[in-house]
Amino acid sequence: MNGNNLSFNNLDWFSPEERFNQPGSFAIVEDHQIKAILAATPENPSTAWLRFYHVDRRSDHAKCFANLIGAAKNTLQKMGARGLFALAPYSWLESLLLAEGFKPADTIVTLQRDFPVQSTPENDDEIVIREMTQRDLVVVEEIDAAAFEPAWQLNPVSLERTYHRTAWHSVALLEREIVGYQMSTSIFDTAHLARLAVHPRYQHRGLGRRLAQDMLETFSAFGVTSFSVNTQSSNASSLALYQSLQYQRENHDILVMSLDI
């Protein structure tokens, strides 16, 4: 395929080449050329996501999408998946998804904070924040599965990839037990809180705030001045947390769509 095409890539820690080697990936080939290519691969046994879709503009992109998403659905059904989710940042993609029976499910919102934070001493000696190690991932996987609904969970492979691709990752401990974690990326003077979760048994005790504050303080110490985070518009507690840390909601929400399969 060349640059004359419609393209969508999901927010992902894996490359399109890696995704295309997973079940749920298909291509349409004509005259030895790829006309359209799609990956809709599982994240866990019950849930899959549309990872990417590329189609030559000169092709019937609606027909191509219908054929490819249909093939992916058949594969996912055989694997036991019950839901297929997709981000729809473009109107053309939203139209294609609606035509195949997808419905609006939620909205991803971005929040931004454009000034650093000063380190402040914490009075709660019960909570300990330390750097995450790879050995912690076994517990982090359990926390992630407990804290998120299936559509938003990351499987162990994805969590390990996230760990290796993020610049700062930390865990929160209560009585020497890991009960929460965060992973964040950074480039130049910007940082992004990519993942934060607290085990449901320990939520509403200030752990999420301590982890988010740790991210701000760590990157601020290295000269970072701009911070961002994404969450769902339906997640009121998450929105309240970030806004209490002076993040401001941006005006470029992304629609989340879902299909029962």
Residue ranges and their predicted role:
Residues 36, 106-109, 180, 251:
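A structural microfeature
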